[in-house]
Amino acid sequence: MSNIVFLDVDGTLIELPASAAKAVDQARAHGHKVYICTGCSKAEILQRNLCDLDGMIGGNGAYVEDNNHVVMHQCLSKEDVKNIVDWCNERHIGFYLEANSGMYCNDYMLEQGPETMVKYAKGKGASLENAKSSAQHFIDGFIHLQGDELYRDDVNKISFILRTYQDHLDSKVDFPHLVANTWGGKGEVALFGDLGPTGITKRHAIEVLLDYLHADAKDTISFGDAKIDLSMFECCAYNVAMGNGGFEIKEAADYITDDVNEDGLYNAFKYLKLI
């Protein structure tokens, strides 16, 4: 029996170990389909040295692609983007617009981003040296825009640095019609907030993809490491939490594997007889 596997097992900055790429390659060779299911948008994914996949779900479910074919794409309205950009700038908050065409940031992101990204990478298990290198690589990937240039109509979601958790709570109050989440480092410490279109979740995106593939949810397996991945767990038949994941995702999992940097993905693929 072939399975459809959805992966969101690591952070934005942390490269998957060689064993993970090996596991994905072997699973696909055995007839299984493997998709990345991530908060990142396509431009961010393309910057990374990932193995071959059958497709991707990006922007926490805003974008669905199968073998280079766009199955679904739902962006924020230009009006919402303008309002969020102005909201962040008024608060002197660093942010970046996540689009398939690129990652577009404001002045404050260039100032505040490196320190926050180092915290993020260290929380995901990177050494200080690697965290600094990864953070700089990530910042270098931004396209710096100013003023009206940031009012775009191709944005999947917007991530912004949290000065305190209150920034996230304020975003929920000020943008009640949008989906507000947080993401961060070890133990899901909230370093960033994000805002995306309403109705968009990883679960919804998986259901759209399964319908497109004429596939059955009983053949699905998901891998997650954070609270945002709980919606994947709601619709997939079997769910795996990474050892470096947060408490809530582990509580909801059918199986907990090792940390991603300790061959957790490869070990779980073997356990599930995908390879």
Name each model feature, range by range.
Residues 54-61, 180-183, 239-243, 257-258:
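Short hydrophobic/aromatic-enriched beta-strand-loop microsegments
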Residues 11, 61, 224-226:
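Active-site metal-binding loops of divalent metal-dependent hydrolases
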Residues 51-52, 60, 174-177, 235-236, ...:
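Short, structured coil segments at secondary-structure junctions
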Residues 2-16, 84, 233:
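Asp-based phosphoryl-transfer active-site loop
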Residues 2-4, 192-275:
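Mg2+-dependent phosphoryl-transfer enzymes with acidic/Ser/Thr/Gly-rich catalytic loops
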Residues 102-221:
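Conserved acidic, metal-coordinating active-site core of Asp-based
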Residues 16-123:
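Active-site phosphate-binding/coordination module
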